[in-house]
A protein has these predicted regions:
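A noncatalytic interaction/capping subdomain that flanks phosphate/NTP-handling catalytic cores
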Residues: 1-158, 162-163, 176-180, 187-300
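Conserved glycine(s) of the Walker
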Residues: 165-167
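Post-Walker A alpha-helix
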Residues: 170-171
Length: 300
């Protein structure tokens, strides 16, 4: 079985050669991220369904995600990712990852149901594909940001903030207003020429918004709830202090931290970044658009 995905212009191919059934697939919203082109993949993942995981010697620990999620160890062949079952905290999948994060060989425990033996693609996508994609993205000057993303015919907005800051709420309001909500939880930002582009991802928040679309980023807002709507300018240092904690960083690859900081500095220098405090009222959509229109008229 083959599964081809496209996320933020990265093509990812999963191949399970034994052709076991894939359970709970495609799970929403990954269906809209399926890639039906024949273009060469950027990340290749080969999967073997097994009764028992192979025994690999685990070298020095590179990263521990804690909370019973996964660990990354160094090996002579690259990196070994140990994915843990969230219920038993025992390994349920192993993956050997090449040093350039373009190939991954995976062994996953089979799942037994009344209809027979199979495998669960979501146990490969989370976290194995995320690790490869995040590393490649950071190495190539992109960002995965804890944020919502919205496209209108003339604008592209990012709303970033900690959990509970209002990303899904704003997404609901903009969706009702007819805008295209790319995600209410995680957005990818990549630069194309002189333009920063925002890309939807299949990782969703409470609103379950996800679209495989992209467009130019025109405004970035650091958001929080308040008694009334208000937009305030921020200094570059203040923007960085608010955005950095919302970035998903590949802490297992310290070589990319410098490039990530350079990407953030470039973004802050070229895209208007402001603080948005808003009351939980739908008219915040009109407020934002009116304030930005007024600012544009004053500037011109």
């Amino acid at each position: 079985m083959k599964i081809n995905l496209q996320i933020a212009d990265y093509r990812i191919r999963l191949t399970e050669a034994q052709d076991y059934p894939a359970f709970s697939w495609p799970m929403h919203p990954f269906g809209s991220f399926l890639d039906r082109s024949d273009l060469h993949p950027d990340i290749v993942i080969t999967i073997t369904v097994v009764e028992k995981l192979p025994n690999f010697s685990q070298g020095p620990l590179r990263f521990d995600a804690c909370q019973g999620l996964w660990r990354l160890h160094e090996t002579d062949a690259g990196l070994l990712l140990v994915s843990l079952d969230t219920r038993t905290h025992q390994p349920c999948a192993l993956a050997l990852i090449t040093k350039n994060f373009s190939h991954m060989e995976v062994w996953t425990l089979g799942e037994q149901t009344a209809s027979g033996k199979g495998w669960v693609p979501m146990k490969i996508l989370n976290p194995l594909v995320e690790v490869c994609l995040l590393t490649r993205l950071a190495r190539e000057g992109g960002l995965l940001l804890h944020s919502a993303g919205v496209l209108s015919p003339t604008s592209g907005y990012i709303f970033t903030g900690q959990s509970g800051a209002g990303k899904s709420t704003l997404s609901e309001f903009f969706n009702t207003d007819g805008a295209s909500v790319l995600s209410d939880e995680r957005m990818i930002i990549r630069k194309s020429g002189d333009t920063f582009l925002i890309h939807g991802t299949p990782w969703v928040g409470s609103g379950a918004f996800a679209k495989n679309e992209s467009g130019p980023l025109t405004e970035l807002f650091c958001i929080s709830h308040g008694a009334q709507h208000r937009i305030d300018r921020l200094s570059p240092s203040a923007v960085l202090a608010l955005i950095l904690p919302q970035c998903f960083l590949p802490h297992w690859d310290r070589s990319v931290i410098e490039s990530t900081m350079a990407c953030l500095s470039d973004l802050i220098a070229h895209v208007p970044c402001q603080r948005l405090t808003f009351a939980k009222q739908p008219d915040v959509v009109d407020y934002i658009q009116n304030q930005l229109t007024r600012t544009t008229l004053v500037a011109s």
